[in-house]
């Protein structure tokens, strides 16, 4: 009977230790899932921009339609252009982040066939980010692979 009680106590201790270790690992691991929700073109003109979008109205003014759930997430929109020939698209090489900065390495790829003449447009990529990682004042910068600045903003 004593043996069974000892095993039971050891099992409880092992279970609690495993649970505690699991929680420590989960708390220490702050992986954030950023989803690319949409990519395309918009006829809303302007230059290169990186914008933080917190509501449907602002997203609509950019000419972007996407099912963003603003109650639990926010959008980050990279706009590049304008262009007057069809076929441009954005290529995002990497996204890196720390507590003070988010760095996006991206560029636009020109069409292989030089494209067709078109009304001016800009390309965009929309990322969805959970609200739990929103930190006012964090710098968001977009650079080319050769480290030339494209656009910068701060989380308001």
What are these regions (language model features)?
Residues 28-156:
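Exposed, flexible binding/inhibitory loops of compact, secreted disulfide-stabilized domains
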Residues 5-6, 19, 145:
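Compositionally biased, low-complexity intrinsically disordered regions
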Residues 17-25:
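Bacterial N-terminal signal peptides
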Residues 1-12:
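N-terminal secretory signal peptides that target proteins for export/translocation
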């Amino acid at each position: 009977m004593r043996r069974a009680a000892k095993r039971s106590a050891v099992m409880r201790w092992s279970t609690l230790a495993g649970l505690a270790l699991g929680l420590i690992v989960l708390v220490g691991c702050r992986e954030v899932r950023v989803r690319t929700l949409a990519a395309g073109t918009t006829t809303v003109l302007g230059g290169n921009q990186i914008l933080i979008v917190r509501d449907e109205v602002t997203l609509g003014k950019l000419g972007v339609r996407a099912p963003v759930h603003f109650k639990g997430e926010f959008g980050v929109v990279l706009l590049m252009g304008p262009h007057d020939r069809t076929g441009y698209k954005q290529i995002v090489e990497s996204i890196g982040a720390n507590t003070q900065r988010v760095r996006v390495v991206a560029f636009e790829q020109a069409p292989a066939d030089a494209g067709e003449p078109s009304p001016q447009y800009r390309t965009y990529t929309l990322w969805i980010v959970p609200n739990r990682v929103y930190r006012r004042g964090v710098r968001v910068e977009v650079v080319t692979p050769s480290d030339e600045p494209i656009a910068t903003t701060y989380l308001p």
